[in-house]
Amino acid sequence: MSRKQLALFEPTLVVQALKEAVKKLNPQAQWRNPVMFIVWIGSLLTTCISIAMASGAMPGNALFSAAISGWLWVTVLFANFAEALAEGRSKAQANSLKGVKKTAFARKLREPKYGAAADKVPADQLRKGDIVLVEAGDIIPCDGEVIEGGASVDESAITGESAPVIRESGGDFASVTGGTRILSDWLVIECSVNPGETFLDRMIAMVEGAQRRKTPNEIALTILLIALTIVFLLATATLWPFSAWGGNAVSVTVLVALLVCLIPTTIGGLLSAIGVAGMSRMLGANVIATSGRAVEAAGDVDVLLLDKTGTITLGNRQASEFIPAQGVDEKTLADAAQLASLADETPEGRSIVILAKQRFNLRERDVQSLHATFVPFTAQSRMSGINIDNRMIRKGSVDAIRRHVEANGGHFPADVDQKVDQVARQGATPLVVVEGSRVLGVIALKDIVKGGIKERFAQLRKMDIKTVMITGDNRLTAAAIAAEAGVDDFLAEATPEAKLALIRQYQAESRLVAMTGDGTNDAPALAQADVAVAMNSGTQAAKEAGNMVALDSNPTKLIEVVHIGKQMLMTRGSLTTFSIANDVAKYFAIIPAAFAATYPQLNALNIMRLHSPDSAILSAVIFNALIIVFLIPLALKGVSYKPLTASAMLRRNLWIYGLGGLLVPFIGIKVIDLLLTVCGLV
């Protein structure tokens, strides 16, 4: 789900942005943007010259100089407005998040258990390690981990999803977020952060972007723009002595106008807005990025590691068949499989219990009355089970059970290997059940590949992005699902260590890797990946290791994140191309007008046949200001994005924004010149 999008020019935001644009006229704010700082200095200088001319202290056309000065100030204001509007949209999103924060009291427990004595304290005084009790109707006062209990939680204020989620102690669903509301039951929570450090606080700070740091590409582009500005500044400075030597010195006002039209003011004025808008579009997709660097890295990603369950498949694997080993009847296998799954609360575990009940009327046993020891699943052991009445029953992956059988002096039957291969080739996941060292048979778990996912992977392939499916299934099952889904590669029987090693392998080949994760065991790989999208429903460790958080915990958001990142880079590149290309038309407008009196041969460059030198210069300056406003929607929304290879994308952008950048100014400056002439303003 995506959040409700603000209108591009929301009236209240526009009014606020106009006020902020005026406030940003102070030198301290302008200094942060070197290109626009030069325009600001030029505006100040021409204003002083206009006043001097009007008072008679300097010779010259005061009205013309004032017009140039006015439009230079408008140029600065438009650039400020673009940045302020982008920031205003982000702050509006942040304000919606601030509404989630409520001044509340918390019940701080004196002992870490339900029923212990509690003290009522303000929620903002809770510290890391404090234990609190929340019950139905309460707002969770802090980020933390559930240490006891289970409850239905409404997280819509943060995720935008209306469906409640279950939070309970143990496993990967123990993490809770401050500001969410308990709908039923109760939870005992251990606070994991101090005041001001909650996930909501960090979300608000990131969205507001008050301290937004420039990304590496943004810094590199800024350096390029500064270099171009210095070159044009030096070139303009040398033109005055040339014109003076020719006997007709060009005025300082004209030189300032020439400089402003030569330097890349269009991209200089929109650069900050593009960066802020990229972060804002991420939030619109229900993804919080910790920095602009993360969004930018998403645009450069060329390897996607995608979890099979929930991303490629629907993620609701269900037990579909019991396949007994030779000499074992199906009911015996079903009984053992059900016993091994009684404490397994995963959808797969519950489906095994239900299938045994449906096939053989095997009722669920009372867990407490069994006096059994349950063995939980771990990423290392890759199996789970039960120890009961001297019986040791396990279910798990083929390799894990094979090692278990051999460690207990048994032999893995060849007929079970054949059954495992048969299940795997059908795209189902085989789970093997063993009692002691005797293999009882195979459980087939069937999942379904999501509709349309193959076409999405084909689009990613067009963009030269490699897709890798990560799964705990064996190689045969993984290969069958990978072929059906259309991924480029897969990692079967994946462990946390294997995922980490795979990421490092791709990074050693100078590739940028993106992945998703939600569990504590995903944290090392998330920390290593260049773009790491943690699920909001995941553990605190996973969210801290990632550089993005999918608020609605949808793992397919990784593909959307890459699209948004690429769109931001394309927008920046396209507008840079347009900005530099449209300078060419300004050369043909201003240079003949400024120097034709000194060097009549330059009249040959007046291919637009502009009315007069004054109208030519003023038209170019006006166009230079107005083009910033016309490009603000493009900077905020991003350029139209299509899945293409890098070379095809470059050709497309050169045609649209390079050629467009050449033609639009010729038309625009000529139209403005005609209007000025018709209205008798020059």
Swiss-Prot record:
Pfam families (UniProt xref): E1-E2_ATPase, Hydrolase
Coiled-coil stretches noted in the UniProt entry, renumbered to this chain: none
Molecular function as annotated in GO: ATP binding; ATP hydrolysis activity; magnesium ion binding; P-type potassium transmembrane transporter activity
Annotated TM spans: 34-54, 62-82, 219-239, 254-274, 588-608, 616-636, 656-676
Record keyword Disulfide bond present: no
Organism annotation: Shigella boydii serotype 18 (strain CDC 3083-94 / BS512)
Protein EC: 7.2.2.6
Binding-site positions, Mg(2+): 518, 522
Subcellular location: Cell inner membrane
UniProt cross-references to CDD domains, sorted A to Z: P-type_ATPase_K
Family assignment from sequence similarity: Belongs to the cation transport ATPase (P-type) (TC 3.A.3) family. Type IA subfamily.
Protein name: Potassium-transporting ATPase ATP-binding subunit
Membrane topology according to the record: Multi-pass membrane protein
